[in-house]
């Protein structure tokens, strides 16, 4: 019987079919620890689920993971629901997860803690960014559900405390999937209006699921970016939402938020009354002091004898004018003297005087130079004449004029001894007026006696 060989693809598909048709593997509840977690740019999640003895590859596509509130991380223990299948390309089986919950802690609670830590690290909770609530807001915006006790409590409290204030309500959804985008849009709209002084954002109490819109990241960032100060009023005395941490001020209830946003008109009236009384008292004291000062002035010499005071002041003015005239004349005399001194100095140090002095000095130096040049020239001429006379006395031509001559050999070398020639050598004799060509016909040596 001939053997039938399967391809790897055929075998893998067979195994995949077997697994996918097994009802026990199409709805699997599994718990384990996440490792090798990767969040793909398209939104899919890839990771490994493991326990002490085994591991399995896991995939959670974007269509399913967008519903989870927390952020999966390595080391996190989770409870998952999914189905088992085979990834043909690698031949490995894996679980395709449809739902995932944290193991041991609630899904929403974990998501809350993760977002709280992340936003706090970014600085969204810092007091540095908190805006002051205006003490006398003219227009108060309220972002909440248009129905329910919260909006009634807020409006009733504001109108009771501050009836002259304006209230603008921005109706929104406060729970459900559409609640967070609705709240974000209302915050943006209030900021764009440009007339809201303070915003109250909140709702009545409820469970964590009902309050979850106020734990959404988009709501937290919208509150942080708001130019209008925001008071959060979610309605839980003890529990805090993410919105409470980001808001500029947190109120435990909607009624408390209204009291923080709107001043008490009775207290304002009391303040106005107290300040009016203080102002009146201060004005009375000021008028009293001015009256006393006026009485003192009325009793003064100037008020009682104004003509004498006028004459005294007129006399003082005349003296002051005389002193001013004298001072002016002294000042002018002083400046005239200074001008004369400057003129004398300039005349003394005028450039023409300096030029004349320099010209005389140059002429004197020129005459001195001429005398010294003449003396030097005469000295040089005298030295030259003496040197010429000395040279003339030593000149061979001078000796020749006395009958002497110079004898040269054929190579034009001066002969100094009879030993320098031989019989028959040609020699030349230079006299003062010419040269004789001769031939040696005889040689007679003589002894020198003291050079003679």
UniProtKB/Swiss-Prot annotation:
The EC number(s) this enzyme carries: 3.1.11.6
Lineage: Bacteria, Bacillati, Bacillota, Bacilli, Bacillales
Function: Bidirectionally degrades single-stranded DNA into large acid-insoluble oligonucleotides, which are then degraded further into small acid-soluble oligonucleotides.
Acyltransferase keyword on record: no
One GO term (biological process): DNA catabolic process
Reactions this protein catalyses: Exonucleolytic cleavage in either 5'- to 3'- or 3'- to 5'-direction to yield nucleoside 5'-phosphates
Annotated Pfam families: Exonuc_VII_L, tRNA_anti_2
Record carries keyword Metal-binding: no
First-tier enzyme category under EC: hydrolase
Name of the featured protein: Exodeoxyribonuclease 7 large subunit
